[in-house]
């Protein structure tokens, strides 16, 4: 997307490239699922920069890992990484490697190399992502070599795939008509206009090798009010996924895929109903019925 033009409180034109062909849309409603509040930002709306809230990660897979690794213990792998870092055999960043529980029966294992949050919040995000990409991709061969040589379960391992781009956990968010606060999540607060639910812990990936997890009460959940998805500055723009209006801690819970998909469904439903001339209240009622089913 290259342009979003607003006239007063409405976005009237969006310009993008689709397979290198220019595409211009004059929308009645816009649902921004970009993860970066791109439409709102380009249209001049107020946004919040959450790029420094969380560390990014690069996901890759290994093949021919011993399928018994899970029973032998993933903790042993972490201990080996820590010892190698302490002895200077690996860069300190390698201790931030996370293993997704597994491997599968055919020996495929998914790993996440968690990077450090930006040290300079004023650094342009494109420059930061470039630096992260270079750093992470240079470390993967070194990590693989260490695992093959030093951890028995990886003796025959080989690189399977590397994600085409970094996983960015936090980016720009809209300024909404309401804001999901940390206290709303931790207090499992419900809302009469709630359109999505979440129950994942606050999961903060900062400078420590492991995430800081803050859990809700067991079997409880919080609700996200529709106004968190509605731009305060633009009447025909809704945001879903990790770019709706929320505090940093609240978004560290609400950004997970299940909740993100629920906000997308709610935003799309609201947009469709408003195009039909129906009210926001009707959209809330329909979405809440869906949540109860």
Please give the residue ranges for each predicted region.
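Short, hydrophobic/aromatic-rich segments at coil-to-beta transitions
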Residues: 8-14
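Flavin (FAD/FMN)-binding glycine-rich loop and adjacent Rossmann-like elements that form
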Residues: 1-4, 18-29, 33-292
């Amino acid at each position: 997307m290259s342009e979003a033009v607003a006239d007063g409180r409405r976005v009237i034109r969006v310009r993008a490239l689709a397979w290198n062909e220019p595409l211009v849309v004059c929308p009645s409603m816009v649902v921004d699922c970009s993860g970066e509040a791109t439409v709102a930002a380009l249209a001049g709306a107020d946004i919040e920069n959450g790029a420094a809230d969380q560390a990014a990660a690069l996901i890759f897979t290994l093949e021919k890992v011993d399928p018994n690794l899970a029973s032998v213990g993933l903790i042993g792998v972490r201990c080996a990484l820590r010892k190698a870092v302490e002895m200077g055999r690996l860069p300190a960043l390698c201790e931030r490697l996370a293993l997704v529980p597994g491997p599968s029966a055919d020996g495929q294992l998914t790993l996440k190399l968690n990077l450090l949050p930006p040290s300079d919040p004023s650094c342009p995000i494109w420059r930061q992502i470039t630096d992260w990409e270079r750093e992470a991709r240079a470390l993967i061969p070194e990590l693989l070599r260490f695992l093959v040589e030093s951890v028995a379960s990886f003796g025959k391992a080989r690189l399977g795939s590397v994600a085409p781009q970094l996983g960015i956990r936090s980016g720009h968010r809209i300024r909404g008509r309401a804001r999901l606060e940390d206290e709303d999540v931790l207090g499992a607060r419900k809302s009469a206009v709630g359109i999505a639910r979440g129950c994942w812990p606050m999961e903060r990936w900062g400078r420590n090798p492991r995430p800081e997890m803050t859990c809700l009460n067991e079997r409880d959940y919080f609700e996200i009010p529709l106004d968190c998805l509605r731009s305060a500055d633009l009447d025909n723009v809704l945001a879903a996924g990790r770019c709706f209006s929320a505090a940093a801690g609240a978004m560290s819970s609400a950004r997970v895929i299940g909740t993100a998909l629920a906000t997308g469904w709610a935003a799309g439903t609201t947009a469709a109903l408003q195009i039909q001339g129906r009210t926001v209240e009707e959209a809330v009622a329909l979405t809440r019925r869906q949540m109860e089913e």
